[in-house]
């Protein structure tokens, strides 16, 4: 099996933690590095959360801090979902794990420039790090094999009626990425909301056990409450983990090629991913957009990754 080389760019975040857990353990993925961006919470908090997850699960992958602010807009956070720390719920041991000194954007540029064009970028937060890397060094564009991202929606948003949080947090960055010409795969809310993590799924991961089962339970029990309070959902979707699922086996997720444009005009549609589902604009498709996911397969995959952390001495 070919191992997909990836850089995971994230803003941990409850579902980000699940994505890290899966990407670091599954044999189909070669996780080269984790880059952190501000998003669900401010950068100082998302960085600590990423380091905590890596320390708890003994994930020995370098972690790099990136953009603390969006490119243009005033910063927003998703504390209504992720809490004051950005990863409320689990209790971690005192943190000894440290981030690398290199800036995430420099790491992304240097790693891509030294590569053979075989690295996939997996941004599951606001696209600030990726967009700044593209603007700082446009020569990286042909080096990117593919960008598999979590963000947007072809239907309704979740932070405004039009916009999904990751895109709304930095629409200008998203505009840079969606006009880059790099092959894009978008896991938007229409798909990711199919991965609602109900109490029976949490119980299944608890039964699977080990440090990842425990962390999954602590994390997803917290979002049970916030997702119901905010959106009336029966649990928290693991939005970001769908990108890892797609990379492991794209057959589990049905996609449709569409032309996608990010609205950066101020107004009620600011941050909307305008997806030309019917092809009415006549513009060539630039994105594979996730439509449906085989949830039985997906939760089986999550459980497989959880079990991978159980120590056998």
UniProtKB/Swiss-Prot annotation:
It holds the Pfam family IU_nuc_hydro. Substrate binds at residues 227, 239. Its cofactor is Ca(2+). Its EC number is 3.2.2.8. One of its GO terms (biological process) is pyrimidine ribonucleoside catabolic process. InterPro entries: I/U_nuclsd_hydro_CS, Inosine/uridine_hydrolase_dom, IUNH, Pyrim_hydro_RihB, Ribo_hydro-like. PROSITE patterns: IUNH (PS01247). The keyword Hydrolase applies. Keywords: Calcium, Glycosidase, Hydrolase, Metal-binding. CDD domains: nuc_hydro_IU_UC_XIUA (cd02651). Disulfide bonds: none annotated. It catalyses: a pyrimidine ribonucleoside + H2O = a pyrimidine nucleobase + D-ribose. Ca(2+) binds at residues 11, 16, 124, 240. Binds 1 Ca(2+) ion per monomer. It comes from the Bacteria. One of its GO terms (cellular component) is cytosol. The active site is at 11 (proton acceptor). Belongs to the IUNH family. RihB subfamily. Hydrolyzes cytidine or uridine to ribose and cytosine or uracil, respectively. Has a clear preference for cytidine over uridine. Strictly specific for ribonucleosides. Homotetramer. This is Pyrimidine-specific ribonucleoside hydrolase RihB. The lineage of its organism: Bacteria, Pseudomonadati, Pseudomonadota, Gammaproteobacteria, Enterobacterales. The gene is rihB.
